[in-house]
Design a protein with these regions (language model features):
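Preference for long, amphipathic alpha-helical scaffolds in soluble/luminal domains
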Residues: 1-215
Length: 215
């Protein structure tokens, strides 16, 4: 969600949180008939779509993340099936691990989002979930973040690739050192500024968004 025109934090935040909160409360209940708006949202997010779990925006990865960000905290059988699809994909032994110039160049936001979803839905004790957290800690760069850029000359972590792992590690709770280092990465940038020049990295980041995706 992006607002056009000048940013008005107070008004925008009130409208944004009100709308999200209303939908979140509705999503905690099973839709009665599917005719109400919340029921249609829930039905759409729980529907099984063909294709890869990461397919934008119908894949299980994205639908589960939306449900969790809307406040759903209990996984029904449909959500469990979708979670298993995501975990099977991420933990597939044949999935390549990219390491270039001494740094892991992985799309760590994928594991980070999955870790957050699993922990919010009560699957934090699943060994597969622990493996996701362990991999994120192993792939973390020395500056505290992550980056999927394959170019050897890139040595600075990406904001986009680092926020999801931070959220997931905080939710999982057993890799506090990695989570602290990731938090420090964002704090050094004062959340949205260049570490080297103190400039705003992207002025779009000064606007309120939901969902907080970069696409």
């Amino acid at each position: 969600m992006s607002h056009g025109g000048p940013c008005r934090p107070g008004r925008d935040l009130l409208v944004l949180t009100s709308n999200i909160g209303r939908l979140s409360r509705s999503l905690q209940q099973k839709p009665k008939s599917g005719s109400d708006q919340a029921g249609r949202h829930l039905s759409a997010l729980l529907r099984q779509y063909p294709g890869h779990p990461y397919k934008k925006w119908q894949g299980a990865h994205w639908r589960l993340l939306s449900l969790v960000e809307l406040g759903v905290v209990r996984a029904d059988p449909t959500m469990i099936r979708a979670l298993n699809q995501v975990l099977d994909w991420l933990l597939d032994p044949a999935r390549p691990v990219s390491r270039i110039a001494g740094r892991y160049r992985m799309h760590a936001s994928q594991e980070g989002n999955a870790l957050l979803v699993c922990c919010r839905l009560g699957l934090g004790g699943d060994p597969r979930v622990s493996e996701l957290a362990s991999r994120l800690a192993e792939w973390q760069w020395s500056d505290g973040g992550w980056n999927c850029d394959p170019r050897p000359e890139v040595t600075h972590s990406s904001f986009h690739e680092s926020l999801a792992p931070l959220r997931g590690l905080v939710a999982q709770g057993t890799f506090s050192d990695a989570a602290t280092r990731a938090a420090d990465f964002f704090l050094r940038h004062r959340l949205y500024r260049s570490e080297s020049g103190d400039l705003v990295i992207d002025r779009e980041w000064l606007r309120l968004h939901w969902p907080a995706y970069w696409h």
